[in-house]
Every structure is written in C-alpha cells, then in structure tokens.
Amino acid sequence: MISRLIENFKNIKIAVIGDLMLDEYIMGKVERISPEAPVPVVKVTEEKFVLGGAANVINNLAALGANVYCGGLVGKDKNAEKLINAFPKNVDCNLILKVDNRPTIVKKRVIAGHQQLLRLDWEEEFYINEDEENIIIENLKNHIKELNAVILSDYNKGLLTKSLSQKIINLCRENNVIVTVDPKPKNISNFVGASSITPNKKEAYAAVEASPSENIDIVGEKLKEKYNLDTVLVTRSEEGMTLYDKEIHNIPTYAKEVYDVTGAGDTVISVFTLAKAAGATWEEAAKIANAAGGIVVGKIGTSTVSEKELIETYNNIYSNN
C-alpha cells in the first residue's frame, strides 16, 4: 500500500500558504574571548541557509515529489531572493507576494561546538492588509481547480488572519479540496471548518483552555466539535499521536533516538496531508506521518524525508501489525 501511495505523490498538487522564513546558520569554533568585551570570538567555518517556517513545509512536500505552490509574503530584499532560490525545482513561487513595508523573515543562529550562542531575528509585527489579502485569494482562485490540497502553516507572524483564513477554507470547501492547518493556539478560531488541524499536545490543551489533568481524548473531541473539523491529529512526543476521526486512533511512537525536534511538526503536516491527498484514509495518513516524524527527529536540524526512507520505515513499523 505504502509504495503505491508514494508513487502517486508525484501526481499531487498542493498549495502551502503561511509564514515564510529563511534560517541562516553560522557555524564555527570558539578559541578565545574577545578583548573588546567579555564575549566569545567565533571563528567561522561554515555558513548555510535553510528553508524555515512554512517554507520548511514546502521543502518537505517537494522532497517527496509533490508539485507545490508556495504562498506568502516576503520583502523586496536580498533575503527574499535567497529564500526563493533555495526552493527545489518542483515548487512554483508565483503565489508569493513581495511587499515594500516589511522585511523577509530571517532567523540567524550562531553555533559553536553544537551549542547555539546567539540568535538574531529580522522581522516586524504586522497583519496583512485588505489589498494583500485580495491578491492572495485571487491568485489561489486561479489554481484551485487543479489543487488536491491546501496547507495553512501558521507561525503567528500576521499573515493568516481570520479573514484570509476563512476565505481560503471556504474556497477549498466549495471546490472539494482538502485544507489542513498547523495552528498556533491563540489563532485557532481563525481556522473553523478546516478538514484537519495538527497541534501538539500542549497546543491542543491551550486551544480549548483545558486543565493539564483533563483526559487527552476529551480535549481532542472538544477541538473537533468546537471548531467544526473533520479530524484532529494531536502529536504527543514520546507518546506518539492520536487521531480524532469518526473513531479515536492511538498511534504509538517508534523513534529510536531523538536528536532534534526542530521542524518535526512541519514534516508531520506535510506527509499527513500529502498521503491523504494521494488516496490514504485519515488513519493511514496519520500512520505514514508518524513514520516520517520518527525519521526527522533522528536528524540534526531542520530536515526532510526521502521516499526510500519513508517506505522502509513504514514497512518496518507496520508490516507485522
């Protein structure tokens, strides 16, 4: 089953709309303290750029062969060009809107000896205006008939307002297009009526203002009912995942070693949505996403999953189940 599904990934078209970011890493060694101030001097050995935020969701989809439309806001600056040029060839960037009044979001990290010493952020707080919203919606309308799914990747940077999110969700519903969301708890009411959301356990509890002692299944069902969702997939770290569909499906974790959880949520929503769009049931899609999540947490930094890794890992977990 998994091989046939993954073979179909190359036929799937997905639009990702969300907070695009560029992650910059400056790697080096610390051998002395600066004479100018009591701070370490980092001798730089490597500098690299990695797709972050919603751009990492896109990168995960592209790595598995999907055809991806990228939607979001960037500045009219050099970092926007770096971000756009970093996308794989199977990513269409025509839905990206370049604006004058804010910079492309960049997170620069200085790392020495596997230790993060400093992070510098280039971003400004904003909410998308009506004109920008209308452009994004009109661009999406031009492609909606050919799409299998839309992912809304919310990092609470001001793009996915309630107005824009509801217009996107309604457009998807009218055209029988799956729409999934990785939401921040404070914005979850923006996404009423989506096909599915993929919060982690902490986010799920915060979204319904549940006490820590409340049963996770009650929380999951509350989320589904309150926000009129078809399904909810709650990621639970070492406890695995729980899918709230017509039934409750507990999916145990399998990750052998956890090195870095950076971007794991991006991988989960990417694979969950892609598998569903390719013909899996929600439960099958959750199991495939679980396998993918287990792979990326075993890698250092923001990572993607290959088709080969996903097939092998899925078969190792589920072939005897």
Feature annotation, model-predicted:
Residues 95-102, 109-144:
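Conserved phosphate-binding/catalytic loop of the ribokinase/pfkB sugar-kinase fold
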Residues 230-231, 254-317:
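Conserved post-catalytic alpha-helical subdomain immediately downstream of the catalytic base
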Residues 1-31:
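Positively charged, low-complexity intrinsically disordered leader regions
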Residues 20, 155, 267:
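Active-site metal-binding loops of divalent metal-dependent hydrolases
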Residues 15-17, 119, 148-151, 180, ...:
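Structural motif
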Residues 146-159:
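Short acidic, glycine-rich surface-loop motifs adjacent to enzyme active sites
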Residues 2-5, 35, 39-105, 312-313:
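Substrate-binding N-lobe of the ribokinase-like
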Residues 159-249:
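Conserved phosphate/ATP/ADP-binding segment of small-molecule kinases
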